[in-house]
Amino acid sequence: LAESILDRFEIGATTALTLFAPRRMGKTEFVVQDLLPMARERGYLSIYVNFWDRKQDPADSLILGLTKATSQLSTASKIKQNLSRFKAGGIRTPIGGANLQLQGLSTDSKLEAIQTLFDRLLTDGRKLLIALDEVQHLGTNAAFEPIVYALRGLLDPHRDQVHVLYTGSSRSGLQRLFRRRNAPLFSSSQQIDLPEFGTDYLAYMAKIFQQATGRVLNLDACKEAFRLVKRVPYDYRQIIDLLILHGGEDILAITQAYLADHSLEAIYQAEWQALKPVDQAVLVWIIKGKSGPYTGEARQFIANQLGLDSVDTATVQNAVNRLRGASKIAPVSLGCYELEDPYYADWILNEVQHGT
């Protein structure tokens, strides 16, 4: 996938791509550990910005990411002259970025710093690959509008030198941001999905486990464990770590214990009870149904769930809008949706099955 992305950039097929994957599916690891190192090998100067690093102020996230990228400059020390107003302080990114004291700076000062940093990176002469992780966060607050406009001002004039990978873990959040009329920056980006991990990944992890412990895992048991954690690599890696720690080879027993320890029962119960009955019915149909929620069959199912003779399309549309606004569902094709959280989908089915 990393080669494919870079090849598309290099042949001029596009200057911007959007990579979607639900949380904990390995998206950030792919970008940081695979894509960006490969880009550097191909002569790119790489920039990684995670807008969840500093959720309250994405400008800080952008400054931190750009500052970290200056370590790739042969004359990185010169950047200090441009940032003399920043004092060494206690802000540190999770990936070990530079320390900067940003607290108390005005928005204008931060935007000026962003422009200065970006200009300095451009003057290096290499092509830039900037990965903007969890970019959908920019659409969650009107106060973040200056960052959206700043990004447009940074990127648009330099499409011949700058390639962009937008990434996000909320399909609905990305769609809301990209469809905004006042954010044409994102409209030209082509979307790709992070491929799901399969048997090759499980065999690789089993090999790593054997090298670390001398113990052999049954591949069929690994497949079942992976299925139980909804094919989420993060959870599967946690299970492998627990198995290394506790000993033995019973990956299914460790998986069941892990799921019990990380149950979201209380959270899901509260979320479910806070939903309107029609929203609950729409969720159940989306999980169980074979068509979108607007068909006659779907609306009759929803009506039956509510104890009504019928429901109109507008009622269903309002429910869908609420669920999308709360990032509970996201469209996957015209008129069809899926839940953003597969664990929540399983919990709902179990809730309906037991009639609670």
Regions found by a protein language model. Give the residues of each.
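N-terminal pre-P-loop "Q-motif" helix
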Residues: 1-6
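Phosphate-binding P-loop
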Residues: 7-14
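P-loop NTPase nucleotide-binding core
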Residues: 14-25, 29-129, 138, 144, ...
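Walker B catalytic acidic pair
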Residues: 133-135
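Sensor-1/coupling segment of RecA-like P-loop NTPase cores
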Residues: 137-143, 150-181
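Helix-loop-helix "sensor" segment of P-loop NTPases
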Residues: 176-227
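Amphipathic alpha-helical "lid/sensor" segments that cap RecA-like P-loop NTPase cores
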Residues: 207-267, 277
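C-terminal leucine-rich, beta-strand-based interaction scaffolds used for sensing/assembly
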Residues: 266-356
